[in-house]
């Protein structure tokens, strides 16, 4: 399962806006889970024990969040309500680390593209393990069992070991 970092606004001018931001972060987290991902949404839980209004605690929370971001496969950016200062820092960090940042509105399309890429890589890997006669052909044409069997085994191996992305 791929690990993703959820990036969305948290700071707010008033309680209603804060509630909206929290609900949005929760919805993004649910969307990621439903997509088969393991989301990390630090601003939902770090703010439960750290005071966002105290600069030292905010800095400690941001540092901890960025350390978690480094371990993620990609970042989902929820930009529906704009990009906050904290989000900007998270996105810049992801870019500097070479971690992809995906717009939350495009997550489904992104996941479909990654799955197509994974399937193509699996197929290439399996065909690479075919016999010399069949390499590069769409179908196995030599009718030799060991060629088809080795290709099938390579395909099954690749299917369990290749991740999308």
Walk through the language-model features, giving the residues of each.
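Catalytic phosphate/metal-binding cores of nucleic-acid and nucleotide-processing enzymes, i.e., regions
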Residues: 1-118
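Positively charged N-terminal leader segments that act as targeting/secretion signals
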Residues: 116-119, 136-138, 143, 164-165
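Short, intrinsically disordered terminal segments enriched in charged and Pro/Gly residues
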Residues: 119-125
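Cysteine-cluster motifs in flexible loop/terminal segments that predominantly coordinate metals
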Residues: 125, 129-157
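Short, charged early-sequence alpha-helical segments and their helix-coil boundaries
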Residues: 156-165
